[in-house]
């Protein structure tokens, strides 16, 4: 489903390169590192393509970007604020400018799957941009986000 959608949308865009599917082991490793179970639609996306080397992050990039954010931003925020504004997100795509498309994880540890957000790193703010991954992908490749 996602692979076909992306292939259709990236026609003529040489910068997007769909990768091979992600292994279940790598998805599990990414979930363990991030500390939250991934929503089924994100797992389905990774099972079809492990990123696109531009917008969509691979499982390994999800880990490395989460690691970087956890290392960089604590110096700017108090512990509680860091937990709320940085650590409660599952980042899975990027705009290339340091901001991430993500799911929000609620205080009870459950993932909010009703929306996809953009996490703006300079302000530590989020804004809803899509209702699901398919809508986000469509908007991104049509230059609507």
Predicted regions and their residues:
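Compact, glycine/acidic-enriched structural inserts
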Residues: 125-135, 139-142
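A surface-exposed partner-binding patch
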Residues: 1-101, 144
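Generic alpha-helical propensity signal that fires on short helical segments
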Residues: 52-56, 60, 107-110, 119, ...
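Segments surrounding the PLD/"HKD" phosphodiesterase catalytic module and close analogs
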Residues: 102-130
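Intrinsically disordered, low-complexity segments enriched in small/polar residues
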Residues: 98-101, 115, 138-139
């Amino acid at each position: 489903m996602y692979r076909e959608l992306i292939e259709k949308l990236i026609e003529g865009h040489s910068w997007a390169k769909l990768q091979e599917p992600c292994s279940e082991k790598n998805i599990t490793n990414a979930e363990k590192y991030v500390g939250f179970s991934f929503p089924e639609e994100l797992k389905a996306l990774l099972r079809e393509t492990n990123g696109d080397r531009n917008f969509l992050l691979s499982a390994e990039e999800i880990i490395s970007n989460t690691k970087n954010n956890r290392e960089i931003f604590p110096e700017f925020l108090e512990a509680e604020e860091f937990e709320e504004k940085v650590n409660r997100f599952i980042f899975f795509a990027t705009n290339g400018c340091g901001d991430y498309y993500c799911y929000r994880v609620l205080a009870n540890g459950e993932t909010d799957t009703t929306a996809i957000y953009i996490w703006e790193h300079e302000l530590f703010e989020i804004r809803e941009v899509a209702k699901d991954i398919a809508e986000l992908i469509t908007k991104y490749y049509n230059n609507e986000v």
